[in-house]
Amino acid sequence: MIKSFNANENNIDKASKLRETDIFTHKDFKVNKIRLVIAYKDKFPIKNSNKKPYQIFWLKGQKAEHYILSSKSSIFLGLSNGNFYFSICVNKPEYSEDMYYDLRTLNPLLDNNDLALLTNSRGLSYWHNKNKFCGICGHETKMTDYGHARICGNEACKNKSFPRLDPAVIMLITYQDYCLLGRQKVWPIGMHSTLAGFVEHGETIEQAVARETFEETGVKIRNIQYKYSQPWPFPSSLMLGFHAEA
């Protein structure tokens, strides 16, 4: 895990109660408080890559409002410092392609607020792209709740679905002064990683750590301790970090 995503390290208010309202009529809303990022192919535009932390290219004011009101795919990301943050994902670049960076690259280069906002945007955009049709009746679905749900367009169905999140564990296994690492055949020579895997139904996260470690290496572990968590929208995980002893 490259960087901590501790919730206390950003001041983003998800403002979930606003999702089912007309945000533009909210008592604190003003056009000059709109902030909009236009993503392209899961990449985000950077204003200036010569300074760190990198600065996201946020559209503001009336231009941002026009994009949001004319789009059927705008996502409300939350509130911060009195501003209303949104994102839209487009199929053609709005700016020069060399302005766009993927989130893996941006991860250690953004401040915590921007990183939290873009992580939210990428995870939700991926889910929307994979859920355009109803899983019950097969009818086309449409975005609702400012990007935080989809609803079936079939009046006889109207099934409402919500974003998927897959819990995954990643663990540092140690024995005395050694640590247990793994690698995949397709990785470059010399590249190794701590072990990781998805949590399955009917098990605790600690059991998932022990199971994944044994399945991948044949090593039994003890003293499993949870450490930290972070969003991992590649494509839709919540990564749970552990330490354990072999």
Regions found by a protein language model. Give the residues of each.
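N-terminal alpha-helical interaction blocks
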Residues: 1-111
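N-terminal strand-loop-strand
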Residues: 44, 150-194, 220, 244-246
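A residue-level detector for short acidic-glycine micro-motifs
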Residues: 79, 173-175, 228
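A gly/proline- and charged-residue-enriched helix-loop-helix capping module
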Residues: 94-136
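Cys/His-rich short segments
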Residues: 119-172
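The catalytic Nudix box helix
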Residues: 194-228, 242
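Active-site-adjacent beta-strand/loop module that shapes the phosphate/pyrophosphate-binding cleft
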Residues: 230-246
